């Protein structure tokens, strides 16, 4: 992330931040960019149906300079098949975080503004 800006508040350094025009996207995989596949059925992950609008939109954001990180409830043992699927389908991205808590009903608590976007993949 070479676009990070170092900031100071009251003469003390704080965590670096991205410029205002660059966004940090955290994107779910199952049910968001492809079929919703549970961890209990990993054999389906390699052949998941891609949501074409997701590929077009996310790659556009990447090309605009935004950071794309997939944040999935898939477990670490499914990393290789997940990376292969993302790459074979042409997704451009910076990172992949595994092990997001399952079950939905998420509430995000942070010291930064968090915006949510409901992306209808189908």
Language-model features, listed with the residues they occupy:
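HAD-like aspartate-dependent phosphatase fold
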Residues: 1-122
């Amino acid at each position: 992330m070479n676009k990070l800006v170092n900031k100071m508040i009251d003469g003390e350094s704080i965590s670096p931040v991205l410029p205002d025009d660059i966004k940090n996207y955290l994107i779910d995989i199952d049910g968001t960019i492809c079929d919703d596949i549970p961890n209990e059925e990993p054999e389906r992950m390699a052949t998941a149906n891609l949501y074409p609008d997701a590929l077009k939109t996310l790659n556009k954001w990447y090309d605009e300079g935004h950071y794309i990180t997939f944040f999935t409830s898939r477990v670490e043992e499914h990393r290789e098949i997940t990376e292969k699927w993302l790459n074979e389908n042409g997704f451009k991205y910076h990172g992949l975080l595994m092990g997001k808590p399952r079950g939905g009903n998420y509430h995000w608590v942070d010291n930064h503004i968090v915006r949510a976007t409901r992306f209808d993949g189908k």
